[in-house]
């Protein structure tokens, strides 16, 4: 009887381990989907947006004219 239990026990443990991994994946997915509230009228946000836009424009310009 003990042999039978040892043979089925690893499979049961393995299935439980897979369920735990699945739950961990769902928690991680929920964290990624969490909505972040950013104040778009804040001066810091506007300053950051202008900096990002400027860098992007320079990148596009270099991409379009690589000789410069």
Curated annotation (Swiss-Prot):
Record flagged with keyword RNA-binding: no
Keyword terms, alphabetized: Phosphoprotein
Polar residues: compositionally biased ranges: 1-16
The organism's place on the tree of life at top rank: Eukaryota
Region ranges (Disordered): 1-45
Sites of Phosphothreonine modification: 8
Claim: Phosphoprotein is one of the keywords in the record: yes
Domain IQ, first and last residues per copy: 45-68
Compositional bias segments (type: Basic and acidic residues): 18-31
Homology family: Belongs to the PCP4 family.
Name used for this protein in its record: Purkinje cell protein 4-like protein 1
Organism: Homo sapiens
């Amino acid at each position: 009887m003990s042999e039978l239990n040892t043979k089925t026990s690893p499979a049961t443990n393995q299935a439980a381990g897979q369920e735990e991994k699945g739950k961990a994946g769902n928690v991680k997915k929920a964290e990624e989907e969490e909505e972040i509230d950013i104040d778009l009228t804040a001066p810091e946000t506007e300053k950051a947006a202008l900096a990002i836009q400027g860098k992007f424009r320079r990148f596009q310009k270099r991409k379009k004219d690589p000789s410069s």
